[in-house]
């Protein structure tokens, strides 16, 4: 899905953001450690080569262990809370209004501690993002 050129499109927030979402499945049975994320997502922009995506994502509390994060991502938390604990044992917790980045190859626990709504922009080199 590529985006039209020369267009401006607002990105919904709050209840409108959640209403625009449909089911997604980034969390796999292999990575899931606890809970059921019941993920939902809305894609707002995809590059012509499908390697760069901007979207909104929602998840219920859950935890997963990620061996090799697939891309470079910027995230802004709109609602809820998330704790990221790298293999070095350092934990970072983010809540509404906080932003963070994850780099390709990151390893650690990705734990949603309160129902989460986030906006993200991710670049996944190599194969197109699915």
Language-model features: locations:
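A short, N-terminal "cap"/entry segment at the start of jelly-roll beta-barrel domains
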Residues: 1-51
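Intrinsic-disorder/low-complexity, polar/charged segments enriched in Ser/Thr/Lys/Arg/Asp/Glu/Gln
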Residues: 39, 52-54, 107, 117
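Conserved short histidine dyad/triad with adjacent acidic residue
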Residues: 46, 50-69, 103-104
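Beta-strand residues in well-ordered beta-sheet regions across diverse protein folds
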Residues: 55, 77-78, 85, 111-113, ...
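Active-site helix/loop of acyl-thioester processing domains in fatty-acid/polyketide metabolism
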Residues: 61-63, 82-85
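Short, conserved beta-strand element in jelly-roll/cupin
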Residues: 68-84
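Short acidic-glycine-tyrosine-enriched beta hairpin
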Residues: 88-104
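Ligand-binding loop in jelly-roll beta-barrel domains
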Residues: 104-127
